[in-house]
Amino acid sequence: MVKRVSHEATNCPVARSLDAIGDWWALLIVRDAFRGKRRFGEFQKSTGAAKNILATKLRSLVDFGIMEMVPASDGSTYQDYILTEKGLDLFPVVTALWQWGEKYFFEAGESHPLLRDRLNRKPIRKLEVLAADGRRLRHTDTTLMPQG
C-alpha cells in the first residue's frame, strides 16, 4: 500500500484540501451527512465501508474540523456525527461532483437519485464559477497571483 504524504506545508489550497477530503470515503460520508445521516451505522450501511475504515475516516473528519461528535439527538447513549460550518461549506463541492457525475457517468435515462430544490422539486442550476462582476469564467479566464 502506498503511504499518503501530507500536503500541509504546500502553498496550494487544493493539495491542502485533499489532505482532509481527498479519499472517496470522506466525500461519501460528507454526502450522506448532507442527506441527514448522523449515526455510525447509517454511514456504514450507506457507504458499505468496513467498520475499521469508517471509524478511521470519521475520526479524520472530526480531527480536520469537518464533522463533530455530539450526544445523540434521541437521548440515547450513541453519538451523532454532524457537519460543522467547515463541513457545510463543502455543499458546493459535493453538488459540483454530483452534477459532474450525472453528466459523465450515467447513460441517458439511467436511473439514479435526482438532486432537486426541496421547495419546488425543480432541478438546480448547474454550478458555475463567476467573476466578481457576475461574468461566467472558464479555466482560461483565471490566473494565479501571489498574495500581497
Predicted regions and their residues:
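N-terminal helix-turn-helix DNA-binding core of bacterial DNA-binding proteins
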Residues: C12-I53
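Canonical helix-turn-helix DNA-binding module
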Residues: Q44-A72, S76
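Alpha-helical linker/hinge and terminal dimerization helices associated
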Residues: S17, L27, F64, V94-Y104
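Basic, amphipathic "hinge/linker" alpha-helix immediately C-terminal to the N-terminal HTH DNA-binding motif
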Residues: G22, S73-V94
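A detector for short, charged/polar N-terminal pre-domain segments
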Residues: M1-A9
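C-terminal regulatory/oligomerization modules of transcriptional regulators
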Residues: T95-G148
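Short histidine
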Residues: H7-E8, W25-V30, F40, M69, ...
